[in-house]
């Protein structure tokens, strides 16, 4: 907790008169690293009256945390609430100042601010927490989770059909879905596609029309991720069965060097394999995995001489001899099919450990759906750029939430139970 002198300059009340919630609010904003903001806003002239600079960004953070719906409402509460005035150094911008801020910074400016918050989290060890249950001999790096959510826009329910029966909206970047998502039985505008670390830190978000399928967005999303953080190591990405297509398995691994943990649909293996994908030895005994050779893009299997334990031994098998330590050995190659023979198969230990984490994260954290200050319900902006900024602001706040929790409690994740 941050120590303050009493009374606090600019605060209408004595610090001791504040509630615990109000003290925590001040501590939260005092913990924000201004070096994550000031280098960005200093590059843009005219984002507001002289002296506003970083404090306009703090005001945007207040908007997200307090679930303030519009710029006009934000400008009004900044004038009336002494806590808000204190943490923003008593700035009192007009509502159109925030519109100027968005135009001058643009999506790229807000993305750069978020990037600096993420790198701050990385310096604290929050992107790669040690997860004790994972295999020790795994690829080292950041574990990612991807998901998407619909965003209702202020123009999405005011569409009109043209002569060809197509929907037209005042905001041309939105789309209309006649059937709707299983959780959204109403017209929607945009879709936010997000990548998070397995412990909940948002890494990147892109916005598309709601009609764009998740499969079409995952590669551009990974392009955005690796472009933002070229020096960070990414090891695995956990995806649901909606992404289970051969080209996605292959492209993620080949283009980005990330191992996809994709929940599989039903698979049928060719002759010579068990129904679970284990190859048979020449004498019909199921083999066991011995390791994955990523550099050679293959998985090694061995029989481990299990037939010796069988009542019907095979005396003709030369691989029972002493010089064959693990018995008969064979390989499957990624290039023969990444879904069936790729770098992370359903029977691999890392797959079995990471797969349940996705379900747990969705339930506990809701990814972009529930615990992001109702991002999908609080968007009142038109245009792809403004909607993108809206989502990036939520990413900034959520990243700072995790940083603040770590600084005050030592907790590295709001979604994983890490016993250390």
Please state what every model-predicted region is.
Residues 1-38, 406-409, 413-416:
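Charged, often Cys/His-bearing segments associated with DNA-binding zinc-finger transcription factors
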Residues 73-87:
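DNA-recognition alpha helix
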Residues 105-254, 263-265:
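Polybasic low-complexity intrinsically disordered regions
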Residues 16-67:
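Basic, short loop/linker segments at the boundary and entry of helix-turn-helix/winged-helix-like folds
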Residues 351-420:
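Basic, amphipathic alpha-helical segments enriched in Lys/Arg and hydrophobic/aromatic residues
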Residues 72, 76, 96, 235:
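Residues within the helices of the helix-turn-helix
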Residues 254-255, 259-361, 366-380:
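An anionic, glycine-rich sequence signature occurring as long contiguous blocks
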Residues 87-105:
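Major-groove recognition helix of helix-turn-helix-like DNA-binding domains
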